[in-house]
């Protein structure tokens, strides 16, 4: 990274719009509880495959990213909370695609034997120093060579977000991503029935290959189209749901309220010989249950 790029990165991180809100919450030791009481939920997949995202150049939705004359969603760590304007391709006065490949795009592959067991409880309403939110999750899938990949979470919840709110680590019945400023705008704005952020581990064939990692999962309305294209906001399907599992190539900077790039050790080799630097896995054959109360 050049000195000019480093300076731009620092400026964009300092401009993060959620900083004031997060500062007010991150030292709270006795946060308020969810209105109406806790929500407990279970999300399972016991058969079928999964869709695994591959690095791709995301098409940029003008509703989320604006135009070259009036850009939107550019502050914060690139890829986490914004996309710098210099990282965007322009044609005929409009943003077209991201210049860099990320976990968010249309390219994907399928893998077999997708299994997911997730039990979560949303108790704490807001970001805070302490949380009663909980998630226990194990997800796994298998490549064509018979290797099994897995992600486990959560040894601890991310009770307060470095750059955007995490609502104690678990949030239910909210809108995330896209225009919201909560999570990367490279995903469409999507109604989210349940989501979590926590610290977990990445495994291959039963052996831990990367730990600790920030793990994000969410049950959302459907944001894929024909040929599994990642759609724009106007193309979201509100009457279908799927579960996204994300281990992003970023980690929080210790002692600071920002992220830095750090590839995930997945153990999965891409056709070009490089290791896939993230996991972005979609589960679609779901059994879902929920109730008020712990």
Placement of each model-derived feature along the sequence:
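Predominantly extracellular/secreted and cell-surface proteins with exposed
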Residues: 88-213
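Tryptophan-anchored aromatic micro-motifs
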Residues: 10-107, 196, 200
